[in-house]
Amino acid sequence: MDRGTLATKHANVYAIGDVTTIPIPGRWRPDVPLILPKAGVFAHGQALVVAQRIAAEISGAQPDVKFCADGYCMLEAGEDLAGFAFGNFFAEPSPDVRLRKLGRAWHIGKVLFERWWLAPFGIRRELLGATIKLGGKAYGVPVVL
């Protein structure tokens, strides 16, 4: 499977989510390579890439979008506090993942994201998405929903 296009060796077949084993830079142990974690953030990003590639192919265009392995995770700490880890898992020589300081804002962001994710399509979901994007801009976090 190509880690950027997510295309398999079979024509017109892509792989996303937990069925993938995508090597990333670095080693777990000398004899064990690192692989991209099995996390929803990566499956979501992979689905967006594959959908855009299929749409381009159907319309006769050459697809150029690639999966970049940028990932993030909110880390709940209790008492309405959370941390935020994010990074580029394809960075060389090893994944570049950073952890932001615990704070209430990350907890609020997590709650908003959960509400957005579970909301039916409509004005409420759009407003939640706009709020998340605004918060992302304020905190220097790229947001792709």
Question: What do these predicted ranges mean?
Answer:
Residues F84-L145:
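C-terminal auxiliary extensions adjacent to catalytic cores
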Residues D18, P33-L36, A61, E92-D96:
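Short, low-complexity, polar/charged sequence segments that are solvent-exposed and flexible
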Residues A7, H44-V49, R104-G109:
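Short C-terminal domain-edge/linker segments immediately following a structured domain
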